[in-house]
């Protein structure tokens, strides 16, 4: 599945469907990425060692590029769809909330890299699907690499 990112503004999310699953694609602000290490102690799996993601997303950002987050938008607890709460200090989630996602079914909370907070019913981070970029503004979900023209 190809997604045009050229109109996705910083701080926005789109949710296309891939293999009947919602894909959360977020254009992260630099401040969103900068805050990620600040709450590692509050996460169940901050290094994503027990979570599902391609090797290239096994980093603090859980992404190929800092500015684009790609997740399967299904809670790893019981399969509900987490809602976006990107604003730090959101009144619903409290002053210490760094921004991220909250599952409306049982309250699991995930940061802006899809990592699950301690105290959440979900046991693992949100899944990162395979994906690659074709140029700066085209995201291809479902593949780990894109063949270049003339490659054998």
Each predicted region: which residue ranges?
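Short acidic, gly/pro-rich beta-turn/loop elements at beta-sheet edges
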Residues: 13, 26, 35, 113, ...
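Short, surface-exposed binding/anchoring microloops in extracellular/periplasmic proteins
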Residues: 17-23, 27-34
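Rieske [2Fe-2S] iron-sulfur-binding domain
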Residues: 41-152
